[in-house]
Amino acid sequence: MINDIISDSLTRIRNAGMRKLETTKLLHSKVIEALVGIFQAKGYIESFNVIEEDKKKFINVVLKYDEKGKSVINELKRISKPGRRVYKGKDEIKRFKNGYGTIVVSTSHGVLANDEAYKAGVGGEILCTIW
């Protein structure tokens, strides 16, 4: 049984990138779907789609690589964990890695990237960082 579906999904993406796999399959939830939607919008993955197998939903993620065959994801890190939640205000999530990275924040407006959360003027729980 998986206790933390977000950590599991991030680990599956990270491991697939290290093994240079074209796709990986994640367990479905609304938060994971929003998370990979942000990854796609920011250019860290090619695409994703929701599939259903035996009455269970999964998210199929197509990974993205550069011209040398290296994954475009340098680091994918879970910040807030079930045992230690991390919350930040809007002023503390403005930039990450001088604008090259992205912080994914769970806010009252949904799951947002750090720049979108800053524009909306909301803070929240820091789910993960990616660059």
Curated annotation (Swiss-Prot):
GO biological process: translation
Pfam families per UniProt: Ribosomal_S8
Keywords on record: Ribonucleoprotein, Ribosomal protein, RNA-binding, rRNA-binding
GO cellular component: ribonucleoprotein complex; ribosome
PROSITE patterns documented for this protein: RIBOSOMAL_S8 (PS00053)
Listed SUPFAM superfamilies: Ribosomal protein S8 (SSF56047)
InterPro entries in alphabetical order: Ribosomal_uS8, Ribosomal_uS8_CS, Ribosomal_uS8_sf
UniProt keyword Ribosomal protein present: yes
Plastid listed as a keyword: no
Source taxon at top rank: Bacteria
GO MF, any single term: structural constituent of ribosome
Subunit structure: Part of the 30S ribosomal subunit. Contacts proteins S5 and S12.
Function, as annotated: One of the primary rRNA binding proteins, it binds directly to 16S rRNA central domain where it helps coordinate assembly of the platform of the 30S subunit.
Family from the record: Belongs to the universal ribosomal protein uS8 family.
Name of the protein in question: Small ribosomal subunit protein uS8
Species the sequence originates in: Campylobacter jejuni (strain RM1221)
Gene for this chain: rpsH
